[in-house]
UniProtKB/Swiss-Prot annotation:
Pfam families: Pyridoxal_deC. Keywords: Decarboxylase, Lyase, Pyridoxal phosphate. Its cofactor is pyridoxal 5'-phosphate. The modification N6-(pyridoxal phosphate)lysine is found at K233. The keyword Coiled coil does not apply. This is Histidine decarboxylase. InterPro entries: Group_II_Decarboxylase, Hist_deCOase_bac, PyrdxlP-dep_de-COase, PyrdxlP-dep_Trfase, PyrdxlP-dep_Trfase_major, Pyridoxal-P_BS. It is an enzyme of class 4 (lyase). Substrate binds at H120. One of its GO terms (molecular function) is pyridoxal phosphate binding. Its EC number is 4.1.1.22. GO terms for biological process: carboxylic acid metabolic process.
Length: 383
């Protein structure tokens, strides 16, 4: 590949920009503590995982053997026998959520998708793309779904086969919907377990809860039907990706034969990135679960440190149990832009992903927020 001098200079400028901002992220859930340099040589090849990793494919350059290992690992941590599961490495959390909703729609074609107003924005888009009826449910103060409102709307709609989109860590507050509570409440109104579907969006917390001492319900053992997790968030990856796992019996109803590549396919995207499979494989092979527990404990400790610092000066910061997302009042625009914070209404958050090995970046943010919020308070009082 030959670039013009101007294009070479442009690429070099972007390289230096990336180096400068490599560890900038404190407002969005993307870990930057990864090193996949051992895999760089594979970027010489067009590796395409089109189709089903468990079957033969006529496209020779695939990483199916590695994808099988990845899926076996996630079946284990999400507590479903490997032979009873199927899933794949996706392009990201939205594709995983779409896959789960697609399975649910095929199982219950005329049913309504119920999700809380704190659910990721992409779910509304998914409902439109899949032409599913949908219903937005109110949220509790901490970001969990409002269980009373959920049941009220299911009863009002006379829904016999509700499709529940459960958050295992909401985007802004890290709230985890109580899967067991949802099932109990549905049973109380006479809806049997076989008559509804629960998809779990565990984009960030899916790689936290398996490694803490007292996790909230999140897995197939707790009653879910499918789950997705992002690869670029808690795990860390230079390329956005994700993993989705579902019950094999539900996947088989959408599977189709593809003569062109001599295999079966039940994925959303068809051609899939074989390189991200290698990244996820290397990530799970290079750490033990004990090391992951230590990594998660560090992140949780940093989150609590941030809460304590805010609260020590009277700023009402908080976090949900087992969450590395710290919520606090939204500062002035120049502050949240300076630190690249995610904001929603009158709240902002910081997320203590694993590349924050010490408190320096957190302290810099907190110092600015304290000065901004306390200064605003003094100006209001003075006025």
């Amino acid at each position: 590949m030959i670039l013009s001098p101007a294009d070479q200079e442009r690429i070099e400028t972007f390289w230096n920009y990336c180096l400068k901002h490599q560890y900038f992220n404190i407002g969005y859930p993307e870990s930057a503590d990864f090193d996949y340099s051992a895999l760089f040589r594979f970027f010489k090849f067009s590796i395409n995982n089109c189709g089903d990793w468990k079957d033969y494919s006529n496209y020779a350059l695939n990483s199916f053997d590695f994808e099988k290992d990845v899926m076996a690992y996630f079946a284990e941590i999400f507590q479903i026998p490997f032979e009873e599961s199927w899933g794949y490495v996706t392009n990201g959390g939205t594709e995983g959520n779409m896959f789960g909703c697609y399975l649910a729609r095929e199982l219950f074609p005329d049913s309504t998708l119920y999700y809380s107003k704190d659910t990721h924005y992409s779910v509304g888009k998914i409902a439109k793309l899949l032409q599913m009826k949908s219903c937005v449910i109110e949220s509790l103060d901490n970001g969990e779904i409002d269980y009373d409102d959920l049941i009220h709307k299911i009863k009002t709609n006379k829904e016999s086969h509700p499709i529940i989109f459960a958050n295992i860590g909401t985007t802004m507050t890290g709230a985890i919907d109580d899967i067991e509570m949802i099932q109990e409440r549905l049973a109380q109104i006479g809806i049997m377990r076989r008559d509804y579907y629960i998809h779990a969006d565990a984009a960030l917390s899916g790689m936290i809860l398996p490694f803490v001492d007292h996790p909230q319900a999140f897995s197939f053992a707790h009653g879910i039907d499918s789950i997705c997790v992002s690869g670029h968030k808690m795990i860390g990856s230079p390329i956005p990706c994700g993993i989705v796992v579902a019950k094999r019996q539900n996947v088989e109803r959408i599977s189709v034969d593809v003569d062109y590549i001599s295999t079966r396919d039940q994925t959303i995207s068809g051609s899939r990135n074989g390189h991200t499979v290698l990244l996820m494989w290397a990530a799970i092979r290079s750490q033990t679960n004990l090391q992951r527990r230590h990594r998660i404990q560090h992140c949780l400790k940093m989150a609590q440190y941030a809460v304590d610092r805010f609260q020590a000066v009277g700023i009402p910061a908080w976090r949900n149990p087992n969450s590395i997302t710290v919520v606090f009042p939204c500062p002035s625009e120049h502050i949240w832009k300076k630190h690249y914070l995610a904001t929603s209404g009158n709240m902002a958050h910081l997320i203590t992903t694993a590349h924050h090995r010490d408190t320096r970046q957190i302290d810099s943010l907190i110092d600015d927020v304290i000065f901004d919020l306390q200064g605003a308070s003094k100006r209001t009082v003075g006025f």
